[in-house]
């Protein structure tokens, strides 16, 4: 058996044992499998099963007294559809971990928090750019999640030190809630790669507000290299009874472009709007989005524009188990960034259980 798998299993077993004696340690997870049909104009059509970032982890806290607490989280993604291989071609986050044995690192950190001060976190975690936007996606961590189908940019994907959604070698600060629902947060990533000869330490900052039926946020991220290396986003969601409406706009200062293709430029802005309605244990939703062309540094444009939409729904059997179905259609203006000119259609049906 792979050594990494053994170590992971031992860690989870140890956490479970600790949990019996200490209620502040919890074993948790999300298991999700879907059958996905993909139809690409000018490309291959396929039907596959995908594990959609199913994960198992453990987390806990220790009260240190005087209002100070220590906390930790260690989470691994597992590919239940084929645990002996890396994420398949339909997965968007193939660099979430090494993937050599079906287990990949997700959030893994340790930190301190104090009443009235907030919390400091050290390790691997979501940037201040990625974390607030996931709350606008009713199908987050599914095959048709927003970042997979162009409703959100590539800055919400991946793992690494160069502006990816999950930042490694990172320090994060989250403030306590103030002014009736406001928070500020930020990350600073240390450049641990000596081979690249660069001293760029990416960072991100953000703010959010949540009160009543309103949730709003704004955040900024940069690789701190100078030039085309940043992005800014704004988002809002309004919930009114059983209905919810949301919108989000990402302004590309070059970082969205650089993570999508090797061209130097900016202007590849992304926006989306959506709505959902809940009826008992059922939810239906619709989203529409667009991506803009890249403005090249040397002049001219690169035709990267597209339109995209998604229709979906789910039924909750309980608070922990649900079934869902989604359909998305992304229309590209030209052959760029690995996509052929035309449409990419994805139909997905899945089952999810949280514990």
What are these regions (language model features)?
Residues 1-355:
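Outer-membrane beta-barrel proteins
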């Amino acid at each position: 058996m792979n050594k990494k798998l053994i170590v992971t299993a031992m860690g989870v077993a140890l956490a479970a044992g600790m949990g019996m004696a200490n209620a502040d340690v919890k074993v948790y997870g999300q298991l999700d499998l879907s059958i996905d049909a993909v139809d690409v104009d000018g490309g291959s059509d396929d039907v596959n099963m995908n594990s959609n970032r199913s994960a198992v982890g453990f987390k806990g806290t220790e009260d240190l007294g005087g209002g100070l607490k220590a906390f930790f989280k260690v989470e691994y993604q597992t590919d239940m559809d084929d645990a002996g291989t890396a994420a398949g071609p339909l997965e968007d986050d193939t660099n979430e971990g090494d993937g050599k044995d079906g287990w990949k690192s997700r959030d893994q950190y340790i930190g301190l928090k104090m009443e009235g001060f907030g919390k400091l976190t050290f390790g691997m975690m979501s940037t201040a750019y990625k974390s607030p936007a996931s709350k606008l996606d009713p199908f987050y961590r599914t095959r048709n999640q927003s970042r997979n189908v162009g409703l959100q940019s590539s800055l919400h994907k991946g793992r690494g030190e160069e502006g990816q959604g999950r930042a490694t070698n990172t320090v994060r600060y989250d403030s306590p809630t103030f002014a009736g629902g406001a928070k500020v947060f930020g990350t600073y990533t240390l450049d641990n790669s000596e081979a690249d000869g660069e001293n760029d330490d990416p960072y991100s900052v953000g703010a959010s507000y949540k009160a009543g039926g309103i949730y709003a946020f704004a955040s900024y991220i940069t690789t701190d290299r100078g030039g085309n290396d940043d992005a800014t986003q704004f988002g809002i969601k309004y919930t009114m009874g059983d209905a919810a409406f949301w919108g989000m706009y990402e302004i590309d200062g070059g970082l969205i472009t650089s993570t999508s293709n090797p061209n130097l430029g900016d202007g590849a802005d992304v926006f989306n709007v959506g709505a959902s309605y809940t009826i008992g244990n059922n939810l239906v939703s619709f989203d529409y989005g667009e991506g803009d062309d890249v403005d090249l540094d040397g002049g001219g444009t690169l035709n990267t524009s597209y339109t995209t939409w998604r229709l979906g729904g789910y039924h909750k059997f309980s608070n922990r188990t649900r079934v869902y179905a989604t359909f998305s259609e992304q229309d590209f203006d030209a052959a760029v960034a690995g996509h052929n000119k035309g449409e990419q259609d994805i139909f997905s049906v899945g089952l999810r259980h949280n514990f």
